[in-house]
Amino acid sequence: MLPPQPSAAHQGRGGRSGLLPKGPAMLCRLCWLVSYSLAVLLLGCLLFLRKAAKPAGDPTAHQPFWAPPTPRHSRCPPNHTVSSASLSLPSRHRLFLTYRHCRNFSILLEPSGCSKDTFLLLAIKSQPGHVERRAAIRSTWGRVGGWARGRQLKLVFLLGVAGSAPPAQLLAYESREFDDILQWDFTEDFFNLTLKELHLQRWVVAACPQAHFMLKGDDDVFVHVPNVLEFLDGWDPAQDLLVGDVIRQALPNRNTKVKYFIPPSMYRATHYPPYAGGGGYVMSRATVRRLQAIMEDAELFPIDDVFVGMCLRRLGLSPMHHAGFKTFGIRRPLDPLDPCLYRGLLLVHRLSPLEMWTMWALVTDEGLKCAAGPIPQR
């Protein structure tokens, strides 16, 4: 995701104010959070200590536990002509251009597909080593049964391949235990997030075609699912929609020392098209299908959220801005850990697992008293 540009859309916005609960109740919650954090740190050990065998009726019971899928590296040959012409660029950019035409990678781990009643698919970008982040999401806002108001939600984590750590056996077991890991056979890298976007769109169209909406975000976002569902109540999934923290008039970064550097040879225009910050946004079923189709013919771009904005422009669509998406975090003078502020938002970016657990405990506390205040509007 690109650094925020100095614009009115990214200045601090108003929100609710409130007080943190104090006394024995707060102390009890903090003790629970500490205990839970320690438990999650032992997740890997617990997974290995649990019985590997599934019940006899489980269709995967015959699969050996200690046989994780082996990456089948792409046989796509490098484009040496492009590589020779880009010798003046940083190595990461040369590598991207050399293999930009390679866009078909195998699935290594795959969850079950969506049911016909799936209302919201939560597609979260993660990495193999982010075990604690995935555990935090599953135990907080990803506990979809407690948030869904009778509507069916599905959680999926999106991964590439990141060497041998953590052990592939652990990731394979995590996949079988939670049925929410979607991993492809390409290397985890910032420039490969566009590959992750393309392969996600393909998978959704194939495995979750009936999902009404999809929320795509990073594994360090806090999503207030009830607020997202309330917002979506007025939208038809058959109509185009992509809503989030929209960035307009962003300039390509020409500084070769930052990872967002884009040389003029890769993008000559003065500004990027409008795009939603990649920390998190929501799109309708109709937009998912149209994006997937246009992406198949689009030239890949190193920055994934800008790439989506480029595809939207080709479709003649504009992303919708909503102040409830805080993809650059909560700015001062607002309190970034005010639970009353979170109660009025849809998504907040850049929370650690401990902050996520803390905010979950506070936001879901029925005894929390908040002063009246406006809920962010579109």
From Swiss-Prot:
Cytoplasmic side: 1-28
EC number(s) reported in the record: 2.4.1.149
Pathway noted in the entry: Protein modification; protein glycosylation
Chain residue ranges for the region called Disordered: 59-81
Lumenal side: 50-378
Keyword line: Glycoprotein, Glycosyltransferase, Golgi apparatus, Membrane, Signal-anchor, Transferase, Transmembrane, Transmembrane helix
Organs and tissues of expression: Mainly expressed in brain tissues such as whole brain, hippocampus, amygdala, cerebellum and caudate nucleus. Also expressed in colon, esophagus and kidney.
GO cellular component: Golgi membrane
Glycosylation sites: 192
Catalytic activity: a beta-D-galactosyl-(1->4)-N-acetyl-beta-D-glucosaminyl derivative + UDP-N-acetyl-alpha-D-glucosamine = an N-acetyl-beta-D-glucosaminyl-(1->3)-beta-D-galactosyl-(1->4)-N-acetyl-beta-D-glucosaminyl derivative + UDP + H(+)
Top EC class of this enzyme: transferase
Family statement drawn from the similarity comment of this UniProt entry: Belongs to the glycosyltransferase 31 family.
Function, in words: Beta-1,3-N-acetylglucosaminyltransferase involved in the synthesis of poly-N-acetyllactosamine. Has activity for type 2 oligosaccharides.
Protein known as: N-acetyllactosaminide beta-1,3-N-acetylglucosaminyltransferase 4
Organism: Homo sapiens
Gene that encodes it: B3GNT4
